[in-house]
Design a protein with these regions (language model features):
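Short, amphipathic C-terminal "tail helix"
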Residues: 96-142
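Gly/Pro-rich interdomain helix-loop hinge
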Residues: 4-97
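Oxyanion-binding "anion nests"
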Residues: 1
């Protein structure tokens, strides 16, 4: 979220909204780490989300976060992030600008101090894929 806030000419992505949009994707990415997956499942248990398996619990946690975004009128992805942070069919970050700046944003995100505490350490390719998932609201399957 730190590296995308002011990266685009069309406008500023509010830091809290960026975190809200990215968190479901980041959880899915990090859940490939066994210890992180167990912790996410514990969170789901603590707030009584249900689910029988670790994966089901994580899915319910992600579902809750997406529902909260809907209730707070926060878009699910950068592509639909509109003026004032509101959902829009065409957001403030055009696809061509996003793709042009993607390698630089990904490289800067890898170097961000917060990334060092992440359960999985993404390389350039993974970070670009994760950011694309955050732009298009596509499934994290890597």
């Amino acid at each position: 979220a730190h590296k995308t806030g002011a990266a685009f000419e069309g406008g500023h992505i509010i830091h809290g909204a960026a975190n809200a949009m990215y968190l479901p994707k980041v959880i899915k990415y990090n859940a490939k780490n066994e210890e992180a997956a167990k912790r996410y499942a514990e969170i789901a248990d603590f707030i009584h989300l249900g689910g029988n398996t670790t994966e089901e619990k994580i899915d319910k946690l992600i579902e809750l976060l997406r529902k909260m975004n809907d209730e707070l009128n926060i878009p699910h992805c950068i592509k639909h992030y509109g003026e004032g942070g509101l959902p829009a069919e065409e957001g403030i970050v055009p696809e061509d600008e996003f793709l042009k700046k993607l390698p630089e944003i990904a490289a800067n995100a890898i170097l961000d101090a917060c990334t060092g505490s992440n359960p999985r350490q993404p390389n350039q390719e993974e970070m670009e894929k994760l950011l694309k998932c955050c732009y298009y609201d596509t499934e994290v399957d890597f």
